[in-house]
Amino acid sequence: MLFRSAEKNIRIISLCDTVHVLCRRYALKEDAGGASAEPDLVVRTTEEDIAFEIEKSEREREFERKYGPADPDSDAENGIKREEAYRNADPGTRERLENIRRGNHESLAVYRKIVEKMPFWDTLLLHGSAVAVDGQAYLFTARSGTGKSTHTRLWRELLGDRAVMINDDKPLIRVSDSAAEIFGTPWDGKHHLSTNICVPLKAVCILERAEENSIREISAQEALPILMQQTYRPMDAAAMRQTLVLISRLMTAVRFFRLSCNMDVSAAELSYSVMSR
């Protein structure tokens, strides 16, 4: 499969079909030059790649068990529930679940290989939920399970068709010396909410839960710890150095906010009214 995201043509050569199903909305069609387009990147996966992702997920689940309490909506907690279902299943169901698990972990391996290369195209992965309104993008970031997806859903409820989901989980951000653009990708969370678009990024908002809604603009220095935590950190040393350069650029390219919020639409009313100014 040849698909296009972040203005790059990417060919996937995989062992399972799962990742091709995931990326089909982003596939290059023949009438759009897909038949003759050259890939900017070719990604091949191996059994070792799948094993790495499975082992990593198991370590994360073990950490969650030891150092909870786990958030009921967190990725790790959902993984624990899936593992329990797998152990309790009959042999036929277990085989089907194993095939699903392999495919899902291979999809993670594919994206890892992609984002390892992206810093050399001035692009990084920042974990969060991104929504566009009137041609400007807003990214909400926080630890898993805090309510990022819920908050952008409230934006869509509030703003209707004006609000377009860019990516609900793992968007890519291209950063120049003075501006940032955010892209949809197929790796878009459990609800599969994304659009294959590029939108100027206006603001990044750090989200935390609270009973009462409040928002304030913060400095880039205050935002830095969560940026470092939620940005994908490449294993390759050169890519990691470039990622640090891109984070530094991002700190001067967009505005930063801290939002304490509940799950009422009034939270979206507040955040949109302040961040869109």
Predicted regions and their residues:
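A noncatalytic interaction/capping subdomain that flanks phosphate/NTP-handling catalytic cores
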Residues: 1-144, 154-164, 172-277
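Conserved lysine of the Walker
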Residues: 148
